[in-house]
Amino acid sequence: AAGSGAVAEGRIYNYIGTSSWIAVSSAQPMLLTDIKPYIFCHCVPGQYVSNVSIYCAGNAFRWIRDVICEPEKQEALAKGMDPYDLISEMAAKIAPGAEGLLFFPSMMGGSTITRNPNTAGAFVGLRIGHTRANLARAALEGISLELKMVLNLFEKMVPSFKELRLTGGGSNGFLWRQILANIYKKTILVPSVTQETAALGAALCAGVGIGLWKDFLKVDEISTIKSRTEVQPENVGIYEELAEVYAETARLLDHPYTRLAEINKLV
């Protein structure tokens, strides 16, 4: 949390790596018995870190890269490009909503939000005209819509925040940042240190501990904001509707996931 810049009351950050989580620094912990968030004592005196996670984020998009978008992966490697960049460029040509396609990323079972351990991944709305570009965009949107369900919990706790920090490998994707901004309806801030935030947090603890730095706000000088992604108002409406459909469909899929798991045990 410290290395990501969440060192003051109400600061929120979103980490996207293999898994993903959203966390807030606050004087009062997030006490939700139905969700059971992770609560940690902050290294900042008088603060807690409340964390809600999903278990399949970047690894779901990696699956898209390796299984669905293998041709783009090989093309990118031949050109000396990051495959994720080429896939994102392809997906960016598809309009928001991926032409009626939804992706559910829980490919490793349930998480803090989806408690059913049998929860699985799914594409819903798949049509004959959809291409790999549609599937790639739907994946980025689906992971982001799952995280929006997490963010809704934090908006109850910190109702007036307008921006959040994004760290981890997911912060590198231009399209993903824009999708997140539009779904969250928040400005996405990417600090200059996104991959080594744990090491930066350790350095901050040491620096403050020995009196080298006055407090943990030193992180703002060390890890400055390198990019801001603003909300595109024209795309907010469709994502608000998709968020409703996503949440409704996730609930409807809960029982079939359990039945499929039971059937699989019989094979």
PLM region descriptions:
Residues 1-11:
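Conserved phosphate-binding catalytic cores of ATP/NTP-utilizing and phosphoryl-transfer enzymes
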Residues 1-3, 20-24, 103:
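Short beta-strand scaffold segments in enzyme catalytic cores
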Residues 13-14, 23:
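Conserved active-site beta-strand element of glycosyltransferases/polysaccharide synthases
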Residues 24-267:
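Glycine/Thr-rich phosphate-binding loops that ligate phosphate moieties of nucleotide
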